[in-house]
Amino acid sequence: MDVTEKFDLIAKPPTEEIVTKDELIELLKTNSKPKHYIGLEISGFLHLGSLISTGFKINDFIKAGIDCTVFLADWHTLINDKLGGDWETISKVSKYYADAFKLVCPRVKIVLGSELYDSKKEYWFEFIKFTKHMSLARTMRTLTIMGRTENEEKIDLAKLLYPPMQAVDIHSLDLDIVHAGMDQRKIHMLVREIFPKMKWKVPIAVHHKLLPGLSEPSDYTDSKILGKMSKSDSKSGIFVHDTDKEISTKIKKAWCEEGHVENNPLLEISKHVLFHEFNEILVERPEKFGGNVTYTNSSTLESDFLQKKLHPSDLKQTVSNYLIKIVSPIREKLTLNEELFQAIKKSA
């Protein structure tokens, strides 16, 4: 596989941004096995965005010859009060996350935050060195990476450790590529600003599209981040443990206004999930409604929907059919005992 083919794999949807493209091309030319990571909090049930779309993107990196790691941030999970801040539950759910990503991305490496900190004695020394380059105000502004805002009344001191820890994780893993959803962009830009000052390796940042929730968007100010599928809201997305019937019901109820393409969750799912895995999508409908039609790319599908050549009910049925094909095999192989299921559900 040549450099262009590798680049195209990394750049294909759901990738939304590469910082920078020229640096990535140079990396692919000069490094036969670049090191990648994506860091994840261990919180609620895995869903279409957090596991499947993310996992598909990781597989693109792997196909391009990249050495990929999923970093399960157990300490960050504790800091951010996820799973009730219970360490035993966090540890158990970490195993569930590891099993899930190994299932979807068989060749990925799994690293726990606690394992990294235990094995790297210089971590906290490097952490202090990094924080000397951060002001309190800048730290507060980066809290959006953990779903917080700088204006929240109750921000405990531990939460201020989260952004610099995430940055030092990147250095400690000696990464060439940092990968995340668009909601993590601030920390990656901070890394690219501060690392050169410290003479640390500066990674390329690759950000993928965050799948929107299934309800109508309530805020359009930043469609790249707001309204994403949430692990804490069972109605907002498709979860890997949803039954075929639950998937079908959720898609039928999803917001999908006729002719409206902006922030349309079903068009986003089609583009970033369905067309990632299927070369063509067949819409089955009676002859009186135009008959069957096959789409080979998301642009044509979106164009027909915009022009009202494709009705929302037909799009919903099609998305439901193909999602079931993707989710069902994962659900059948990914076991989750009742005790752990209830623990996650309780803390959601």
Regions found by a protein language model. Give the residues of each.
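Domain-scale selection of a single, long terminal region
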Residues: V178, E193, D222, S232-S234, ...
